[in-house]
Amino acid sequence: LKTGFIGAGKVGFTLGKYLTEHGKKVTGYYSRNTHSAREAAQFTDTKACDSLAELIHESDVLFLTVPDSSITSVYEEIAAHPIRGKYICHCSGEKTSAEAFPDIDKTGAYEYSVHPLFAVSDKYHAYEELPDVFFTIEGNKDHLDGIRGMLSEAGLQTRLIDPADKTRYHAAAAAASNLVIGLLDQSISMLGECGFSEEDARAALTPLVLGNVRHLLRDGTVQALTGPVERSDTETVRKHLASLDSRRDRVLYSLLSLRLADIAQRKHPDRDYTAVEKILEEFAE
């Protein structure tokens, strides 16, 4: 299968480079931003197509690596061309293939959502990390082996997902990738109130955060959990809450700590967490 990319941003750069490096044929790129298309083509040793029609004609698989808000409008442009038998894919974590490509069955093309569970931050180096990344796929069941097989042959890990689960799946990804940034930003701010510079706060937190994540990934959340909630240390929890100046920070601390109490109960089924939960529930609303 020959793959073409419409849109030449970070995801298009990354996936195109990975596929070419792993023996897959990439026809090239088309973008309204001709400079980005040429840059991506040079990076992947492919070509920048002069027209959408050229890329469509030369490709069996089309990845629409454009912003989520543009996917459907770009697809509608594609649908005006002969696309019967082609795989039309987007990389949005939130949109299903049916939402992104309405009435695609009328064109004879096959629709897929192919989402890398990964934050692409550097378009020149992120492709090196893709072997460790899960790609979730949903779409046309009759031709699933084609798109999944191409990715698997290139050494990528794939997992099928039910379209009905797509939004919850995306929320889970956001919790791990985005919400944790907010939590760490709060921690850095609190250390700043204790006299740390931002640079020193990040340096101080690095071994704590990385060690905790390594433990969690190796042994699971139950075994990784430590701290005052796990010990049912009500005095320390009260002091923590008293030290937080804003109601929003106290609510955040309490809601997350209630989740920790659930984990702690699984770790210590015979331990009573009623007292600490009662304290946390006072501040959780």
Question: How would you name each of these model-derived features?
Answer:
Residues 47-125:
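Rossmann-like NAD(P)(H) cofactor-binding subdomain of soluble oxidoreductases
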Residues 27-31, 88-90, 135-138:
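Short, hydrophobic beta-strand segments that form beta-sheet elements in well-ordered domains
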Residues 39-43, 126-218, 280:
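Internal alpha-helical scaffold of NAD(P)-dependent oxidoreductase catalytic cores
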Residues 214-272:
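Interdomain hinge/lid region at the active-site interface
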Residues 1-58:
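NAD(P)+-binding Rossmann beta1-loop-alpha1 motif at the extreme N-terminus of oxidoreductases
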Residues 40, 270-285:
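Short, basic/aromatic-enriched C-terminal tail that caps enzymatic domains
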Residues 24-25, 109, 156, 196:
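Short phosphate-binding/catalytic loops that engage adenosine nucleotides
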